[in-house]
């Protein structure tokens, strides 16, 4: 190899290597791009929360448990139809056995599915309880604050059931907050908490910035033993 060619090799080769390495090196996001991506993700999450909690729920009363297993339950309704209930957590199963009568608060997730056994309608669970009723309906003692200031209620959620699941209470409280107090409807009302205090001093609490975690579901509580329900939106 002559001197001129050798010199060109040593001069050009490092540049070629540098160019090749640059072609395969990912370009990091700028701080503005990272902020925009995080904001878009947050907005999608808030929209999902608003869609979920501002829409209505489905209620089944006096349904018969056909089978109950981890992650799902089949029930026979009073009109003879069969519904398949899908639990948000595959490890959750309420303590009811075949043949028992139950009330359910649910959210529809799929259209009807016709099978040889009957028509299945898929629902996502938001509470299973017994069918016991109260002599007179009870209004939940809900007190709401928005950014630290009282936000009065004309009326609170009212129930004639003796028991409610924590997940059902979560849905009903948040539904009220979205409809009356603007929860999830503006950028300054996307978080906070609700807290239930019972007469015996025990408490239940949920973070408003994310959906209720169904794997933390507790046994149903008697609503006539609720002392206070506080909700803070921020």
Swiss-Prot record:
| InterPro entries from the UniProt entry | Enterotoxin, Staph/Strept_toxin_CS, SuperAg_toxin_C, Superantigen_bac, Toxin_b-grasp_Staph/Strep
Lineage of origin: Bacteria, Bacillati, Bacillota, Bacilli, Bacillales
Q: Which Pfam families does the record cross-reference, listed alphabetically?
A: Stap_Strp_tox_C (PF02876)
Report the family membership. Belongs to the staphylococcal/streptococcal toxin family.
Q: Which UniProt keywords apply?
A: Secreted, Signal, Superantigen, Toxin, Virulence
Gene name on record? tst
Which superkingdom, per the lineage?
Bacteria
Compartments, as annotated in UniProt: Secreted
Span of the secretion signal? Answer: 1-40
| Disulphide bridges | none
Q: What does this protein do?
A: Responsible for the symptoms of toxic shock syndrome.
GO (cellular component) term, any one: extracellular region
Which source organism does the UniProt entry give?
Staphylococcus aureus
Any idea which GO molecular function terms this record carries? toxin activity
Record protein name field: Toxic shock syndrome toxin-1
Quote the Gene3D superfamilies the UniProt record gives. 2.40.50.110, 3.10.20.120
């Amino acid at each position: 190899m002559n001197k001129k060619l050798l010199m060109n090799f040593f001069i050009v080769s490092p540049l070629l290597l540098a160019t090749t390495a640059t072609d395969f090196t990912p370009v990091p996001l700028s701080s503005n791009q990272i902020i925009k991506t995080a904001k878009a993700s947050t907005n999608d999450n808030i929209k999902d929360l608003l869609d979920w909690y501002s829409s209505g729920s489905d209620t089944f009363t006096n349904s018969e448990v056909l089978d109950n297993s981890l992650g799902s339950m089949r029930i026979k309704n009073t009109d003879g139809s069969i519904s398949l209930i899908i639990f948000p957590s595959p490890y959750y199963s309420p303590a009811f056995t075949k043949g028992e009568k139950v009330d359910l608060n649910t959210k529809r997730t799929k259209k009807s599915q016709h099978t040889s056994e009957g028509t299945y309608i898929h629902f996502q669970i938001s509470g299973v309880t017994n069918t016991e009723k109260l002599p007179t309906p009870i209004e939940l003692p809900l007190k709401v604050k928005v950014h630290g200031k009282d936000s009065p209620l004309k009326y609170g959620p009212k129930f004639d059931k003796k028991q409610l699941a924590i997940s059902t209470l979560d849905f009903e409280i948040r539904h009220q907050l979205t409809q009356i107090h603007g929860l999830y409807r503006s950028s300054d009302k996307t978080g906070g908490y609700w807290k239930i205090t019972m007469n015996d001093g025990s408490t239940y609490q949920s973070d408003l910035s994310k959906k209720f975690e169904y794997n933390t579901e507790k046994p149903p509580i008697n609503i006539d033993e609720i002392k206070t329900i506080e909700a803070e939106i921020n």
